[in-house]
Amino acid sequence: MEDFTPWQLKMFQKTLKKKLRLKALKKHLRNLSSSDCCLLITCGDNNGAINFFLNELGGKWSWADFEDKSIQEMSEFLGKEVHQVSEDNLPFPDNEFEYVISVDVHEHLEDPNPFTRELWRVAKPGGKVIVTVPNGDETKIATRIKNSIGMTKEKYGHVREGYDIPELKEVLKANNIEPCAESSFSQFFTEMLELTINFLYVNILSKKSKAKVEKGTIAPATQDQLKSVEKTYRMYSLVYPMFWLISKLDCIFFNSVGHAVMVEGKKG
């Protein structure tokens, strides 16, 4: 029987870190109601799969992304417009959303404040702003390994490694968003597996791709990019169960802050 599952969802099922991010977001959205207006903003490393799964939780969702490379495919997949946005101009009214979620945007910005002020502006009074970024702690072993093999922040399209939880809280507080919850995910083993995948794509596969691959792209983001690495992706699909099992060793670091952090704040 032919499988009609969208390629975005098939690809998501073979991810590690993206699944952990969705799991963490679900915990922060546990009080979401069907009438809540919600906004998700991403920054290029998104094919729409996480949007799909968040939409399944309920609420009335709007979508936005900073880059245009996959917006058309995302809009077609989701059946709803994905807005292209800039850091100081979100095309939404003031006080519009009960939940505003930013996924891995701040580390791309020289100055995080204009964008964070926009998150504050479009959130309703008392609404929640949830921000996730890479952990900016450069002393973490996995981060040191990344930098030592040339997978620096620039390869990911970042202007900084990220933010640790106290730094991210300060950014939110500076823009009148009061932090009220925090979490983290992705420990050493998941990071090393992700690094292996990203290193292979950035340094080898993307250079052979027939589809255009923009600087800062660490994994296929469009169907054409995925088709260009189809044979390698099939091989990865075969070893994915082993990767998944290895990633479970992250439990060894249950007391450590993960390599991705999330802070939830409330608009006063």
Walk through the language-model features, giving the residues of each:
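Conserved N-terminal segment of class I S-adenosyl-L-methionine
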Residues: M1-P93, Y99-I101, M242-L245, F254-M262
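S-adenosyl-L-methionine-dependent methyltransferase catalytic module, highlighting the catalytic core
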Residues: D3, Q8-L16, N113-P114, E118, ...
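Surface-exposed alpha-helical interface segments used for non-catalytic interactions
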Residues: K23, Q72, E98, N113-R117, ...
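GHKL-family ATP-binding catalytic core of two-component histidine kinases
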Residues: P91-P93, E110, D164
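A short SAM/SAH-binding and catalytic strip from SAM-dependent methyltransferases
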Residues: Y99-E110
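C-terminal beta-strand of the catalytic ATP-binding
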Residues: G265-G268
